[in-house]
Structure formats: C-alpha cells, structure tokens
Amino acid sequence: MHLSLLKAKIHRATVTHAELNYEGSIAIDGLLLEATGIREFEQVHIWDVTNGARFSTYAIRAEDGSGIMSLNGGAARHVQVGDLIIVAAFASMSEDEAKTFKPNLVYVNARNAISHTNHSIPTQAA
C-alpha cells in the first residue's frame, strides 16, 4: 500500500500578484522552491487562509530572492493580492518509507523571505 504524505509546505505566504491573463500556475520565489524541494511543474495545493479557497495548480520558478507568490490564469480568480496562503505538495510512498520520512516545512515573513524551517509540526494541545 502507498500513502500520500505532506512532502513540503510554505506556510502563510503573502500573495504578491494575481495575473489572470498569464498561463496558469503559481510562480514561487526560487529560494522557497529550493528550501522546500518543490520542483518546477510539480502539482501543488493552495489553501487561502484569508478567504478559505482551496485549489490545486502547478509551481513555476520566480526570480530567486524576489518574494514573488503570483497566482496565474484561472487560479488568480481565487485570491487577492495580500491574501495569506499555504502552498503544499504531497508525495506517495510506501508504509516503510513513511516511517522515517520528514516533510520540509518553510515559514516565511510578510515579505515571503524564509523566517525558519522545520521538519515537524508541533502537537496541537486542547
């Protein structure tokens, strides 16, 4: 059996552009792609923290260090510039692989620069 586990996420990034007439995708600062291990053209899920929208698209690389988080094409209709989003990618793996796998979690500041990284999410308390 294969499991689908969170591979990587960019947590609470700020949307910098929403380009309706650009070919569909999300352009992500290249440094964030490298930090997460998300590859160009990989499917990603977008969860808009501001408005609750949830959808999927694919990642393309934006200029390194630019802070760009640009939703393009039809995806641009689901967000507004300034919205906070989570970008997540998943990977399929065996149960044995899943036992030792750790996701790449990247947390960013208001300018979409990396503030810190982690490989686990703290336990949620009551």
Curated annotation (Swiss-Prot):
Gene3D superfamilies: 2.40.40.20. Substrate binds at T57, G73, G74, A75. The modification Pyruvic acid (Ser) is found at S25. GO terms for cellular component: cytosol. It catalyses: L-aspartate + H(+) = beta-alanine + CO2. Its cofactor is pyruvate. Keywords: Autocatalytic cleavage, Cytoplasm, Decarboxylase, Lyase, Pantothenate biosynthesis, Pyruvate, Schiff base, Zymogen. GO terms for biological process: alanine biosynthetic process; pantothenate biosynthetic process. InterPro entries: Asp_de-COase-like_dom_sf, Asp_decarbox. It comes from the Bacteria. GO terms for molecular function: aspartate 1-decarboxylase activity. The keyword Cytoplasm applies. Its EC number is 4.1.1.11. Is synthesized initially as an inactive proenzyme, which is activated by self-cleavage at a specific serine bond to produce a beta-subunit with a hydroxyl group at its C-terminus and an alpha-subunit with a pyruvoyl group at its N-terminus. The active site is at S25, Y58. Pfam families: Asp_decarbox. Belongs to the PanD family. Heterooctamer of four alpha and four beta subunits. Catalyzes the pyruvoyl-dependent decarboxylation of aspartate to produce beta-alanine. This is Aspartate 1-decarboxylase. It comes from Xanthomonas oryzae pv. oryzae (strain KACC10331 / KXO85). The lineage of its organism: Bacteria, Pseudomonadati, Pseudomonadota, Gammaproteobacteria, Lysobacterales.
